[in-house]
């Protein structure tokens, strides 16, 4: 079907990428090669599992409803388990489950489809921390699906090792077309979804550049056996204050992805950074409606923004992704 056409079209261009990478690899200094070899030594998953605290299942008064991973409904990725929050950072540093479970419960109750787990760079204990976080959240919330969000590839690998796929594949957050392109390889090797930022070094200057990055990453994923629909392309939502003239470009990029049968996502609330607190939900919900009209299939959002979630649920009705009933907002 269309998937095969996409695959054939991009595999033809794969060879020049391999040549460029081989050339780049030959220039890496010996000390860096040794670090890379240490970083590539196989993880001892049993040792990691033995080193983390036992997971206690706590009744948080909310369960994650079973979902069909094939559903056409818009996918919200809850953004609130993030080490930039002092409360969450402290909880991660001490492996204290309570603040993390509380944030998870609030987002699940509000209707989040996935939860993002951002542990930061986690250089010293990334694999242990991500293993603990994945087990903690999935064992407490009926295998809630997760996006594993860190620059530490070994942490993502360790998290996927203990991940339960009942409600959806794990998401690798994220690759780009520059220094983070190998996150696509990680997703491919682990049958995961990968968020693919359509940028290399800095923000793409126009949609021609965005699509060049998109096709480069698509080519790579397909050559490694991924399904095109497991790459979720992120056009990069830009701040209105300072980049107002670029907003339609971002929306048009989403349409370009959609026209090629590709899925898309992104940090939607970026657009309203720096705007007054009372204005942000209004901007975010207007933008999500416009973006869904262009074919946006997912976004990384604060699910506890009620206006935004009601807008998304309503757009799912208009797009015929969900059957209307008078109680659709309570679903």
Model-derived segments and their meaning:
Residues 1-6:
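Short, small-residue-biased leader/transition segments that mark boundaries at the very start
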Residues 10-13, 168, 180-183, 244-320:
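Active-site-adjacent loop and "lid" segments of alpha/beta metabolic enzymes
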Residues 20, 126-148, 154-157, 161-163, ...:
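Alpha-helix-loop-beta-strand connector modules within alpha/beta enzyme cores
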Residues 74-102, 173-176, 203-207, 272-281:
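Active-site mouth loops of central-metabolism enzymes
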Residues 107, 159, 233, 291:
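Conserved, mostly hydrophobic/aromatic
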Residues 110-144, 237-244:
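Glycine-rich, proline-tolerant flexible connector loops at the mouths of alpha/beta enzymes
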Residues 116-121, 144-152, 169-178, 198, ...:
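Catalytic beta/alpha-barrel core
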Residues 177-240:
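Conserved anion-binding
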């Amino acid at each position: 079907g269309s998937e095969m056409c996409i695959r054939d079209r991009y595999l033809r261009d794969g060879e020049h990428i391999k040549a460029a990478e081989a050339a780049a690899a030959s220039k890496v200094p010996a000390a860096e090669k040794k670090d890379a070899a240490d970083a590539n030594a196989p993880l001892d998953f049993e040792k990691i599992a033995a080193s983390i605290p036992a997971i206690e299942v706590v009744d948080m008064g909310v369960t994650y409803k079973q979902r069909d991973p094939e559903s056409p409904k818009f996918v919200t990725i809850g953004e609130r388990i993030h080490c930039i929050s002092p409360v969450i950072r402290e909880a991660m540093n001490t492996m204290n489950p309570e603040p993390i479970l509380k944030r998870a419960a609030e987002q699940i109750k509000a209707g989040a489809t996935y939860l993002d787990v951002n542990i930061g760079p986690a250089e010293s204990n990334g694999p242990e921390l991500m293993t603990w976080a994945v087990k903690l959240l999935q064992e407490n919330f009926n295998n809630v699906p997760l996006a594993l969000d860190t620059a530490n590839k070994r942490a993502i690998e360790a998290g996927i090792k203990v991940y339960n796929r009942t409600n959806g594949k794990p998401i690798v957050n994220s690759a780009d077309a520059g220094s983070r392109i190998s996150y696509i390889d990680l997703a491919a090797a682990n049958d995961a979804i990968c968020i693919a930022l359509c940028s290399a070094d800095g923000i793409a200057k126009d949609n021609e550049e965005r699509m060049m990055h998109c096709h480069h990453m698509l080519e790579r994923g397909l050559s490694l056996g991924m399904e095109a629909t497991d790459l979720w392309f992120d056009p990069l939502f830009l701040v209105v204050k300072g980049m107002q003239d670029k907003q339609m470009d971002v929306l048009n990029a989403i349409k370009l992805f959609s026209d090629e049968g590709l899925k898309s996502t992104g940090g939607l609330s970026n657009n309203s950074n720096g705007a007054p607190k009372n204005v942000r939900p209004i901007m975010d919900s207007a933008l999500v409606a416009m973006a869904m009209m262009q074919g946006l299939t997912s976004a990384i959002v604060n699910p506890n923004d009620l206006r935004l979630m009601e807008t998304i649920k309503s757009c799912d009705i208009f797009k015929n992704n969900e059957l209307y009933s008078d109680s659709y907002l309570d679903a």
